[in-house]
Curated annotation (Swiss-Prot):
InterPro entries xref list: Thioredoxin-like_sf, Thioredoxin_domain, TMX2, TMX2_thioredoxin_dom
Subunit structure: Monomer. Homodimer; disulfide-linked. Occurs in both reduced and oxidized monomeric form. Oxidative conditions increase homodimerization.
Entry coiled-coil feature ranges: none
Gene that specifies this protein: tmx2
Protein name: Thioredoxin-related transmembrane protein 2
Organism whose genome encodes this protein: Xenopus tropicalis
């Protein structure tokens, strides 16, 4: 049973994993991450490489390369303890693998190191992580439509995500936010997004720094009656975001989504009762 449960979970996730790894971004990133392994292990390429092994075998790792790879594994394990989504886990593996590959290639040959760095730069400039395109119940706003919607109906609570497409944290949070919108969206509680990369004036209006150093993206703000009630992450006196994990559990707890949802359903019921009463009165007048 202990083996069966993980196996079933893996089989259930296979279709999603196949769609995920079929993206060119992840395929090319994986290829760059294992490039030194391929060069060192695959003949006839490896046969012409220099080596520090005592047996002179150029197609196997020497002791220094093993140390670097072990150090990489330790760093990835430490970083992944704070990761939330699969994308973040894989992103950490790719990033630190490329750093290790750079060190290994430069140690092997200066020209190979320069070639590898050039390939990584070209990859970063031409390939971007795929955006989340799954189901969601989210309304996207511009700088003008956001204020209009917030002021249109004071009974509706809005949770707005301020994001930028270039932010890896925003990309990782996208499926979590979409799932929350599908679960909690109703007449009195709605979810929205604003791209402050496209509308920088919005970031100034709500005091959200778009700088990667500020760590303020994504920012979630709860609006009620057109006024800001609560936001995460909070910002310290130096303008840096206070560390906060954008997990589904944290968002539900900090924003009291269960309580907000119950109150919002009462608004929906009141609206339906009012509509039914008006229809009944109209029908009596017609008689």
């Amino acid at each position: 049973m202990a083996v069966l449960a993980p196996l079933l979970a893996f089989l259930y996730a296979v279709p999603g994993l196949l769609r995920w790894v079929s993206q060119p971004y992840y395929l090319l990133s994986a290829l760059l991450s294992v490039s030194f392994l391929l060069v060192r292990k695959v003949p006839p390429v490896c046969s012409v490489l220099p080596t520090q092994r005592e047996d002179g075998n150029p197609c196997d790792f020497d002791w220094r390369e093993v140390e670097i790879l072990m150090f990489l594994s330790a760093i990835v394990m430490m970083k992944n303890r704070r990761s939330i989504t699969v994308e973040q886990h894989i992103g950490n593996i790719f990033m630190f693998s490329k750093v290790a590959n750079t060190i290994l290639f430069f140690r092997l040959d200066l020209r190979m190191g320069l070639l590898y760095i050039t390939l990584c730069i070209v990859f970063l400039m031409t390939c971007k992580p795929p955006l989340y395109l799954g189901p969601e119940h989210i309304k996207y706003f511009s700088d003008k439509t956001l204020e209009e919607e917030l002021q249109s109906d004071g009974r509706v609570s809005w949770i707005i995500e301020f994001f930028a497409n270039w932010s890896s944290e925003c990309q990782s949070f996208a499926p979590i936010y979409a799932e929350l919108s599908l679960k909690y969206n109703c007449a009195g509680l709605k979810f929205g997004k604003v791209d402050i990369g496209r509308y920088p004036e919005v970031s100034s209006r709500y005091s959200i720094s778009p700088s990667p150093l500020s760590k303020q993206l994504p920012t979630l703000i709860l609006f009620q009656g057109g006024r800001e009630i609560f936001r995460r992450p909070q910002v310290d006196k130096k303008g840096r975001a206070v560390s906060w994990s954008f997990t589904q559990e944290n968002v539900i707890r900090e924003f009291n989504l269960n309580e907000l949802y119950q109150k919002a359903k009462k608004i929906r019921k009141h609206q339906e009762d009012t509509i039914n009463e008006n229809e009944y009165n109209d029908s009596k007048k017609d008689q």
